[in-house]
Swiss-Prot record:
Residues holding [4Fe-4S] cluster: C337, C397, C400
The EC number(s) this enzyme carries: 4.2.1.33
PROSITE patterns to which the protein is assigned, alphabetical: ACONITASE_1, ACONITASE_2
KW Cell division (keyword) present: no
Keyword terms, alphabetized: 4Fe-4S, Amino-acid biosynthesis, Branched-chain amino acid biosynthesis, Iron, Iron-sulfur, Leucine biosynthesis, Lyase, Metal-binding
Gene behind the chain: leuC
Subunit structure comment from the entry: Heterodimer of LeuC and LeuD.
GO molecular function: 3-isopropylmalate dehydratase activity; 4 iron, 4 sulfur cluster binding; metal ion binding
Catalytic reaction equation(s): (2R,3S)-3-isopropylmalate = (2S)-2-isopropylmalate
Protein name stated in the entry: 3-isopropylmalate dehydratase large subunit
GO terms of biological process kind: L-leucine biosynthetic process
Amino acid sequence: MGKTLFDKLWNRHVIYGKEGEPQLLYVDLHLIHEVTSPQAFEGLRMENRPLRRPDKTFATMDHNVPTEDIFNIQDLVAKKQIEALQTNCEEFGVTLADMGSDRQGIVHMVGPETGLTQPGKVIVCGDSHTATHGAFGAIGFGIGSSEVEHVFATQTIWQQKPKSMGIEINGKLPKGVYAKDIILHLIATYGVAFGTGYAVEYYGETIRNMSMEERMTICNMAIEGGAKMGMMAPDQTTFEYVRGREYAPSDMEKAIRDWETLKTDPDAEYDLHIEMDASILEPYVTWGTNPEMGVPFSKAFPEIKDMNYERAYEYMGLKPGQTAEEIELGYVFIGSCTNARLSDLEEAARIVKGNKVKNNIRALVVPGSRQVRNAAEAIGLDKIFKDAGFEWREPGCSMCLGMNPDQVPDGVHCASTSNRNFEGRQGKGARTHLVSPAMAAAAAINGHFIDIRKEAVISGGN
């Protein structure tokens, strides 16, 4: 019987262990940031251990970065974590994309942009959205601080092999529907736990026709569906994305010959298989307090089916039967490792251009990396957003999570292009609605959610 992409990647990296038991995997790339690395570095010091492979470790600042003024760090804990990463990287010989560096940004954007993320690798990071890197035909997953220390010391990690799931996605996306809507649809349909215990491969016509940035959006949220890993087979689109980047292989043609073997064999079988027709999708909006609680734009919010729904409605200040258009928005956030890439900003700017943010909305655009910010400014996107009344910020995780100054006030509804809508995720009492960048942009200039499939409703002015 043939092998799945996941089987091939996993088998390449097993150092020790029997099938059915935890196995020791070799780690090709360890990405770190300021929040989950200090304890691990301190553990090395206490045991007087060296960092085994500094050359396979790369650091950046993202979670705590104040995006209004990156050097004005008011929070003492955040400042201490940032200073600790600077000290630790210098002491242990780790390359750091420091504050203000041309390479600084959200860790899951910096890896691909620099060419560190490549097909065939096992990539780990102390962050749950490490599945993003699976879009390149890699195994990427998040780890805890104790595991970060283990990788520091050994360049390996113990893992129980998950089962395999294949999600076949075919059909052309309708106008106004994006990669973000695909993953929100999957989670709303099958739940936040359907991927638990699985490594998911997304494939099919729809995936083949996507850019790398769109593919990363889908893999980024594999964890929201319960899966530890999400991945896609590398193809010519992947190879051309990697080609010419700072850390791309010196012999690309040799690398490509190897990468071309990283695909599921025709006679391979997944432990679970799901099919999806992308041509019938609508723009999605979440109404509740986990990504499963989402609906197509044309649908009303569902009836209460259990205590979780009851609590979610109470927290969000909403009721069954309401629609997304009725939500009283106060904030719009375009950013995060899910949707802060150049193509995301270009699509948002296309909708925003020539319009104005409504008076009831505070709107932020936070590029995911310095590279994206520079590229956006080179083609005038910053001017489009600023002329419309958006705040144009420095790169960082920003309003995706309440760990920096960018937070949504208590009780305020926010249209967000991020990946999680948990209680308090964007700040104490914040009410988060997950959407695509286009939906967020249209909401900012209309003052509420609209059906972006109807061009006539995209109009601005205060």
